[in-house]
């Protein structure tokens, strides 16, 4: 296995363990506390959560990119990365107007909700594009769980 790819897989596994459930619990508790007390300390917490989401999307791109054999698959992987970044930024931006202007919060909340509602449609279309060019592309989870077996299969 390529040494750089092996380090990327190891780093992605460590990030998943660190950033998975603990941050989700912190996010939910912070959100509930913020709604009850109007605490402004939630904005930096949401910044950390959104940076983590964007970094996770970047790690998914770095892990899956070596398996892409067609340029159109790489393009779709980049679209998915940009989509992840937009989701992360919109999650952070949603919380700032809550303290400044409630009307802006409602407007931005509606935009974020529409973006979230169309996520499954976008994912389905991206999967169709990927399978049209390369049907055997492994998923992020398969690569993290399979490790060297997936890499060896890809090299054959």
PLM features per residue range, with description:
Residues 6-9, 13, 65, 125, ...:
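Residue-level detector of alpha-helical secondary structure
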Residues 36-39, 67-74:
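Membrane-interface helix-boundary motifs at transmembrane edges
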Residues 52-60, 75-98, 111-116, 150:
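Hydrophobic alpha-helical membrane segments
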Residues 128-156:
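Short, intrinsically disordered, charge-rich cytosolic tails of integral membrane proteins
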Residues 101-123:
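Alpha-helical membrane-embedded segments
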Residues 1-62:
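N-terminal first transmembrane alpha-helix
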Residues 34-41, 97-105:
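Transmembrane helix interruption/hinge and helix-loop junction motifs
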Residues 51-68, 122-130:
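Membrane-water interface of transmembrane alpha-helices
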């Amino acid at each position: 296995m390529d040494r750089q790819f092996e380090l990327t897989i190891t780093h992605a596994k460590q990030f998943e363990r660190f950033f998975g459930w603990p941050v989700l619990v912190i996010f939910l508790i912070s959100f509930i506390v913020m709604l009850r007390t109007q605490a402004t300390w939630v904005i930096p917490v949401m910044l950390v959560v959104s940076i983590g989401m964007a970094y996770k999307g970047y790690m998914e791109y770095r892990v899956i990119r070596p398996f892409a054999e067609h340029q159109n698959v790489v393009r779709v992987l980049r679209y998915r990365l940009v989509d992840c970044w937009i989701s992360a930024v919109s999650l952070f931006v949603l919380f700032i107007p809550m303290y400044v202007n409630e009307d802006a919060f409602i407007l931005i909340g509606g935009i974020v909700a529409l973006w979230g509602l169309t996520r499954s449609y976008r994912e389905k279309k991206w999967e169709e594009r990927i399978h049209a060019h390369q049907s055997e592309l492994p998923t992020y989870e398969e690569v993290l769980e399979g490790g060297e077996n997936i890499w060896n299969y890809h090299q054959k």
